[in-house]
Amino acid sequence: MKKTSLPVGMHDKLFKRARVMYEIERDISNLLIKQGFNRIETPTLEHFEVFADDVSSEHYHLFDKKGNLLSLRPDITSQIGRVIASTRVETPIKFSYSGKVFKYNEELRGLANEHTQAGIEIVGYKTQDAIKDALLSAKDALKASGLKDYKFEFSHAHILQTIFANLDIPETAKKELTTFIQDKNITGLNEFTHRYPSEFNALIRQLPFLFGESHQVLKKARQLTNHQTILSALTDLEDLLQELAVSLAEITLDLAQIASMPYYTGLMFKVFGDKIPDAFVSGGRYDKLFERFGAKELTAIGWALDIDSVYQAIHDHIRF
């Protein structure tokens, strides 16, 4: 009987979990409002084109009574792009939000398909000021959530984007390469470079090892490529990390970091802990997102904190 069962990836949150997650969402939301972020709420349902140009198997879709194809939102940043493009909201502006997002995972992976997020978007400000503001607000939000042990992990979208843009290979091969990079599959990457040789062979083969302390990672990466776009991205990362060294306790690089959203255009970052594999925070720059909605390019950066992941990390230490 389906009356008493839940769809794949959906879960009831009872008692302790429900209360603690509510308190985390509330505390972060109040903190961000006090820091000058403008609270925004967007619909759970949108036209599917807001999130993707094509129908995605990772999104939940349904038709309304007029036959329009809708999506349960898989992220909130795309909705902010729509708001900026379709309203008279003036920039520069800083938004904060919280709410549910939905993304379909295959049943055998055992992952949740519904998550609660809290996050921010900083639009139209000077790039370096916006980056610092975003990262420091993320640090403050993590503190407000009760999380103590974590590290920031940085990368740059132009690194992998440049590799993929210059590989003249089928889409199926690009998807295969994405999987190898994501899984840090050393054997798979070696075999791939033999099947599809390119100027990026050395860099592709070493991607699983371009992780850890920033100075060593940057030094090694520069020895593997002469491509100017990638070298510029490495310089951007180096300059930023030098500025952030005092503000953020533990910083690492992972140049094989796959963009959590397709619209990232520069700096990307995630926050991880030791207890669970999922990122607590994912964020980055997305200056070109607004062009999808017919608006001009704007400097923009944001992050989303996964409250479900934070709860998994801290619940053992919370008395109920």
UniProtKB/Swiss-Prot annotation:
One of its GO terms (cellular component) is cytoplasm. The keyword Cytoplasm applies. It holds the Pfam family tRNA-synt_His. GO terms for biological process: histidyl-tRNA aminoacylation; L-histidine biosynthetic process. One of its GO terms (molecular function) is transferase activity. Transmembrane segments: none annotated. Required for the first step of histidine biosynthesis. May allow the feedback regulation of ATP phosphoribosyltransferase activity by histidine. Heteromultimer composed of HisG and HisZ subunits. Belongs to the class-II aminoacyl-tRNA synthetase family. HisZ subfamily. This function is generally fulfilled by the C-terminal part of HisG, which is missing in some bacteria such as this one. This is ATP phosphoribosyltransferase regulatory subunit. It comes from Streptococcus mutans serotype c (strain ATCC 700610 / UA159). The gene is hisZ.
